[in-house]
Regions:
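Short S/T/G/P-rich N-terminal loop/turn motif that feeds into the first structured element of a domain
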Residues: 1-52, 59-72, 80-104
Length: 104
């Protein structure tokens, strides 16, 4: 399994952060779920710093790399709509994975 970690900054307030999260739920995730190899999505927020970390998980490195063109566009569009910027995008091999996440 492989992961792509994206750091966004520039969320001016809670409203812009909530708008971003809504865009992800309504527009980004439906597209990403359809990409072969997609295995998961986590968004971590820090309202005080106006930052979001997004981790997408992929079944293989090849599938993660193949998703780049689509995900670059989605990232840019979502950030632009809320006045945020993409600070960095990094790729990793997942060494350990254990998720048991309750909604909320």
């Amino acid at each position: 399994m492989f992961g792509r970690l994206t750091r966004f900054a520039g969320f001016a307030d809670d409203a812009s952060l909530e708008l971003y999260l809504r865009l992800v739920r309504e527009r980004v995730l439906p597209v990403v779920r359809a990409i072969p190899g997609f295995s998961g999505y986590l968004a971590l927020t820090d309202g005080e710093r106006g930052e979001v970390l997004v981790l997408t998980l992929w079944a293989s490195e090849q599938q993660m790399r193949a998703s780049e063109e689509t995900t670059v566009q989605l990232r840019s569009q979502a950030a632009d709509k809320v006045g945020a910027t993409v600070l960095s995008v990094e790729r990793f091999r997942v060494a350990i994975s254990e998720l048991d996440i309750a909604s909320g």
